[in-house]
A protein has these predicted regions:
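Hinge/lid segment of periplasmic solute-binding proteins
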Residues: 52-103, 156, 160-162, 246-248
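A structural signal for short loop-to-beta-strand junctions that line the ligand-binding cleft
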Residues: 39, 46-47, 73-108, 142, ...
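Short, solvent-exposed loop/beta-turn-alpha elements that line the ligand-binding surface or hinge
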Residues: 66-80, 142-144, 148-151, 165-191, ...
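Conserved N-terminal structural module of periplasmic/extracytoplasmic solute-binding proteins
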Residues: 1-56, 208, 254-257, 279-283, ...
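Extracytoplasmic/periplasmic substrate-recognition and gating elements
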Residues: 111, 239-304
Length: 386
């Protein structure tokens, strides 16, 4: 977990205040589910664990204590931040994050544009194409940072970018999940991916080995104007200066997208183990309540972890990207939901990622992406749900 030491510090602070010991167990990157399975089999299983959304909850709902009567649930600012299993509140989101296209204001201005010039995909393409054509004159290597497809970066495209066509399909069909994605908006997915890999700092054939750190270095080194990432990346890009950072929605060319905002949601939901003793369940609920209501807890989550938490006592974050995200909402823009928690499996994401990489390298075609997206979804959903 990214914030392991922060959570351990917070747990130690709680123990100091209350005398109640709190042990924090963390997992290696990408190993949370495996670690949780082995921990839950122990005689002293964790009393608190997390799921990433509806798909994660499906695996663990039988272990989830109903939080509907808890003080913690009463502190939520909106019921939409709770995951339900029937009438029971099985899980509660504890951090809300936002992503889009972060941009360097200074470089965009030097190219002769402002955010007001970009209200949809056609505008974004026009501006990016122009920057790419004038890259030598502007002193950049490309409009967009490299869309690295190694394990440190591919989630930005096989998951976060893939969220857009899923969101619009769900919206058009009036659904919140599906056993068979139709791929209605995959042409839109193609055109934004084409833009990312064409108006880029590097040859698309090199993307398989490009990393998340490469993209950060290009962006902070002022070699690219646009960088797809989220509020959590502020620490990586803060050297450019707060006033120099802007954020655009990820436009994919859908009707009405001038009213689209940034992508906002959560992949982090707290669950309390219903197999724990009543005393341990209450102790866990007391700790969580303290985290989201006490000055020490809310300060640690806002300042040390940089979180926006969906609870009434939340402190304002000093992260300027969060301020930008809040402004989109205040301006009446419609936030794009995080639908990727309904993606059928990690294997599905990997299949889409491999197909995107092959397409960029010229060793595969777009049909391969469509197959991985649509057929892969039906197959993985069936494997997961029988």
């Amino acid at each position: 977990m990214l914030f392991r030491s922060d959570w351990q510090d917070l747990a130690a602070e709680y123990t100091k205040e209350t005398g109640v010991p709190v042990t924090v167990v963390t997992a290696a990157s990408g190993q949370y589910e495996t670690t949780l399975m082995s921990e839950m089999e122990k005689s002293e299983a964790p009393t608190l664990f997390q799921v990433n959304g509806p798909v994660g909850l499906a695996n663990w709902k039988d272990y989830c204590y109903d939080l509907s009567g808890s003080q913690l649930y009463g502190e939520l600012t909106s019921d939409s931040f709770a995951l339900k299993d029937g009438d029971a509140v099985a899980a509660i989101a504890y951090v809300i994050e936002t992503y889009g296209i972060i941009y360097n204001k200074e470089l965009l201005t030097a190219a002769g544009y402002t955010q007001d010039d970009i209200k949809g995909f056609d505008d974004l393409k026009k501006v990016a194409d122009d920057i790419q054509a004038r890259k030598a004159e502007l002193g950049v290597d490309g409009a967009f940072t490299s869309a690295g497809m190694d394990g440190s970066s591919d989630w930005r495209f096989k998951t976060h970018l893939a969220n857009l066509p899923i969101y619009y399909e769900y919206k058009a069909d009036g659904i919140g999940s599906t056993d068979a994605i139709k791929g209605t908006y995959l042409d839109n997915y193609k055109q934004i991916w084409d833009l990312y890999i064409t108006d880029s700092t590097c040859d698309p054939k090199l993307l398989a080995s490009k990393t998340g750190n490469d993209a950060v270095a290009e962006f902070t080194g002022k070699k690219a104007v646009f960088y797809q990432n989220g509020t959590w990346a502020y620490g990586d890009v803060s050297s450019l200066g707060d006033d120099n950072l802007g954020m655009l929605p990820i436009y994919i060319g859908v009707e009405g997208e001038e009213n689209q905002g940034l992508c906002t949601g959560s992949e982090n939901f707290w669950c309390v183990n219903n197999a724990a003793s009543e005393a341990d369940i209450q102790a866990t609920l007391d700790f969580l309540y303290w985290c989201v209501t006490s000055d020490k807890g809310t300060s640690a989550m806002a300042d040390d972890m940089g979180f926006v938490i969906p609870f009434k006592a939340a402190k304002d974050s000093t992260n300027p990207l969060i301020g930008i995200a809040n402004q989109y909402v205040a301006d009446g823009k419609t936030s794009v939901d995080w639908c990727f928690s309904t993606m059928p499996s990690e294997e599905w994401k990997n299949g889409v990622g491999s197909a995107l990489t092959a397409y960029a390298a010229g060793t595969g075609d777009w049909d391969g992406v469509v197959t991985a997206f649509v057929d892969g979804w039906a197959k993985e959903y069936k494997l997961a749900n029988g």
